[in-house]
Each structure stands twice: as structure tokens, then as C-alpha cells.
Amino acid sequence: MENKKTIYFLCTGNSCRSQMAEAWGKQFLEDKWNVYSAGIEAHGVNPNAIKAMNEVNIDITNQTSDIIDATILNSADLVVTLCSHADAVCPSTPPHVNRVHWGFDDPAGKEWSEFQRVRDEIGEHIKRFSETGE
């Protein structure tokens, strides 16, 4: 019987950071967590996010850019906002939903090295969370 918790990664456009977080989450957390991502808006998956994750042998070409699903939001065990905009405007969550903010810079429109840096920072944070719960 599967009894996984649900983690929901949110950012503004569900294009870069939350896509990377979903991929890293599936890499490090999938045995204990159902992993989803969404945005305040759906901007499509950024091609550089796909390229950055391919560099670490994680394929996100089949991930979709989605707007926040109220059902997932209200039933998640943990909601993680990845940018200050999502943290500020994310719909309110019920008291039983643990909500935290892990801020990462937006690499969109920046140098390629920013995508790599943000990818690695998100991956390290999620790996640490998988090991320590923090």
C-alpha cells in the first residue's frame, strides 16, 4: 500500500525553478513523496531548463507547465515556494498544509551559467531535504 506524502513546488511561471525542483524532487524524494510543480501562470518549460537538467542526466522534456491546482495545493503535505513573487501571491493554504519558502534566483533571460548555478543550488537543497527533512 502506497502512502506517500505530497510536495508541491511553486514559482511564478512554472518554467525554470519549479521545473528543476520537480525533477530533482523525483530524483531524490520519489520513494516517499509524490512530487508536483506549478506556477501562478504557465509560461511553458524553458528550453534552457531542459538543457540544464540534461547536463545532469535528468530528462524533463515530458514535464508540463501548469497553473496551481487547488486540489493539490489544499491536500499537499508540503508546499514550497521558490521565488518571492510566488510566496507573496500564492493562494492561501489551509492550516494543515506546511508551507515554506526556499528562494532561488530566476535564471530566465540570464547567462547560461546562471541556469547551471540555480540548477545546482536547487538540487543541493532538495538532496539535503531528502537526507535531513530541512
Swiss-Prot record:
Spell out the reaction equation it catalyses: arsenate + [thioredoxin]-dithiol + H(+) = arsenite + [thioredoxin]-disulfide + H2O
Task: List the SUPFAM superfamilies hit by this protein, alphabetically.
Answer: Phosphotyrosine protein phosphatases I
By its UniProt entry, which Gene3D superfamilies does this protein fall under? 3.40.50.2300
GO MF, any single term: arsenate reductase (thioredoxin) activity
- Which cysteines are disulphide-bonded? 11-83, 83-90
- Which protein family is it in? Belongs to the low molecular weight phosphotyrosine protein phosphatase family. Thioredoxin-coupled ArsC subfamily.
Explain the purpose of this protein.
Catalyzes the reduction of arsenate [As(V)] to arsenite [As(III)].
Which named protein is this?
Arsenate reductase
Q: What is the native source organism of this protein?
A: Bacillus cereus (strain G9842)
